């Protein structure tokens, strides 16, 4: 079995505007728990096993505004090493998420497209 897409993330220079746009356009709902620092968890209304997502601020020193897919992997370091061997690069090294929600990393494919990893 392949590695499934587990999460989408929309980053914006104006996350409030992005949240309003996407929730109104697609009839999604959003919740921004205080412990997530303004990051909005999105409920698309799809079944629980569907891909979930969030909307957050773009990092001026990191990822540009855009849409990022997160792929579930067993080993972040091994996947990043494999990506680099295939011509990709590491954009964000493995980083632990709050509340025991696993860890993430972000790679760039050979064309420069960002792809999130979640373990």
Where does each model-flagged region fall?
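Vicinal oxygen chelate
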Residues: 3-6, 10, 31-33, 80, ...
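N-terminal first-folded block
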Residues: 7-42
């Amino acid at each position: 079995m392949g590695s499934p897409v587990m999460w989408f993330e929309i980053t914006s220079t104006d996350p409030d505007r992005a949240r309003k746009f996407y929730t109104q356009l697609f009839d999604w709902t959003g919740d921004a728990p205080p412990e997530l620092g303004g990051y909005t968890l999105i409920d698309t209304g799809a079944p629980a096993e569907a891909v979930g997502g969030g909307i957050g601020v773009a990092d001026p020193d990191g990822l540009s505004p855009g849409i990022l897919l997160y792929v579930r992997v067993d080993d972040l370091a091994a996947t990043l090493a494999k990506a680099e061997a295939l011509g990709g690069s590491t954009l964000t090294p493995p980083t632990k998420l709050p509340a025991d929600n696993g860890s993430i990393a972000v790679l760039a494919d050979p064309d420069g497209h960002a792809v999130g990893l979640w373990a």
